[in-house]
Regions:
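Generic structural signal for well-ordered beta-strand positions
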Residues: 44-45, 71
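C-terminal tail/sorting-segment detector
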Residues: 69-95
Length: 95
């Protein structure tokens, strides 16, 4: 099954603790970057940065940054970029 559009789903569960799933769909194969930012715009974690086939993809975030440290309670932004398209959504970590 190949989706008909580029889309980013709301993470589930939301709010989450300690993990959440982020899913997105692509109609064609493309370079993809899925990154989590804090509300100050600082990069927290890169979940994916690769060339992926068209279809639906799901990633799990464990609430940790690039150094493996647990991040604090709060709202985070996850951003999906593919080609010239970017979609962002908010999620909340509650401890």
């Amino acid at each position: 099954y190949t989706p008909r559009e580029f889309s980013l789903a709301q993470n589930y569960p939301n709010p989450f603790n300690p993990t959440t799933e982020i899913s997105f769909a692509m109609d064609v194969a493309s370079d993809v970057n899925l990154t989590i930012y804090n509300m100050l715009g600082q990069k927290v974690k890169v979940l994916e940065n690769a060339y992926l086939a068209g279809g639906t993809h799901t990633y799990t975030w464990n609430g940790q940054d690039e150094l493996g440290q647990s991040v604090s309670t709060g709202v985070y932004l996850y951003t999906l970029t593919s080609g010239n398209q970017t979609i962002s959504k908010k999620m909340a970590l509650m401890k």
